[in-house]
Amino acid sequence: MYVMKQSGWLEVICGSMFSGKSEELIRRAKRATFAKQEVKIFKPAIDNRYSTSSVVSHNGSSVDGIAVASPKDIITHISERTDVIGIDEVQFFDETIIDIVTQLADKGYRVIVAGLDQDFRGEPFGVVPHLMACAELVTKLQAVCSVCGSPASRTQRLIDGKPASYDDPIILVGAQESYEARCRHHHEVPRLDVGTTLDN
């Protein structure tokens, strides 16, 4: 990573499920802690897969965190002594999070957010694309396709072992029993209305 001459910036860690986003957020948070910096980690209250408060990766790594229902709640937990702010599963927050992280970075905090850049349909997910555009540093991670072993950039949602329909709800918090990492060619999203295609 390049050296910042001024304090205060935004880092985005993104990718599909099982690509190591939370793991990378935890690594950066622990590294900052080793450097004697005060770190505060947050996650949306909706994400309670492994813990109601700690940020936990699929591999089992964890760091203490604070679950918040609203992005505005993050502000109440930050002090002048705070150096680094981490936010996991940022895609589950509403657009308020964009203003919050922008203000925090402008005030001199190092802000690190991690989240899915695509939903299960393979389309841009919530606030993440906007945050990527505003960030000084974007790290896009890839998983391994569960079908062919190629680099995977997409998240496959499975319902009873079958690909979820395009019309299913976007938000459905789960873990490996509900989702798999897939490459472009093995990512399946059945649609009732196919619309325009390139086929003749």
Curated annotation (Swiss-Prot):
Protein name, as recorded: Thymidine kinase
UniProt xrefs under Gene3D superfamilies: 3.30.60.20, P-loop containing nucleotide triphosphate hydrolases
Family (UniProt): Belongs to the thymidine kinase family.
Coarse class of the protein's main subcellular location: cytoplasm
One family name in Pfam for this protein: TK
GO molecular function: ATP binding; thymidine kinase activity; zinc ion binding
HAMAP family in the cross-refs: Thymidine_kinase
Enzyme Commission code: 2.7.1.21
Domain of life (superkingdom): Bacteria
Biological source species: Bacillus pumilus (strain SAFR-032)
Cellular compartments annotated: Cytoplasm
